[in-house]
Amino acid sequence: DARFCATTASMCGVEKAGFEQDAAAMDKAIQLDVMLHAYMFTQSGIPVIYSGDEIGQVNDYTYKNDPTKAHDSRYIHRGAMRWDLAANADDADTVEGKIFQRLSELEKIRRSEKVFMTNADMWTVETYDSSVLCIGRYYEGEKMFGLFNFSEYDKTAWINETDGMYKNMLTGEVRKAAGVDIP
């Protein structure tokens, strides 16, 4: 079986960090999970959040107990929605709440900013680091850069855009788009 199957949260380390009760690893796993969804939100088209991804639902191994499914690893991320965990979505102190609230914020930004229109221009920007991706979007006078750190270490994106000041859509910070630190 050459497939790569798992929930987003499990691929990002949420499952492992929870099993090991490692708070620092959990914070990094949540950051990676949210970053991957942010990357998805910068793409054109309709972003699709798979059932359970909005709360960081981890792999469901119970498929192995069903002889009709045990041979197909895709069932690992097709488990039933964990409504008991979804009940934690409003609690910012839980994994589910941290992920749900941050994805909700990304969704709100995507809906409200015209730079995410389907017919916006989209391109990549050189970051001088193969583990850092920068995606630019432009629509009707608005420009946005999305920075994505695929490294396990904090990085600085050397994108050196010199055409003005930019506002971080998540924090509201206004700054130049040059030498941007990203976790």
Regions inferred by a protein language model and the residue ranges of each:
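Active-site and adjacent substrate-binding regions of carbohydrate-active enzymes
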Residues: D1-P183
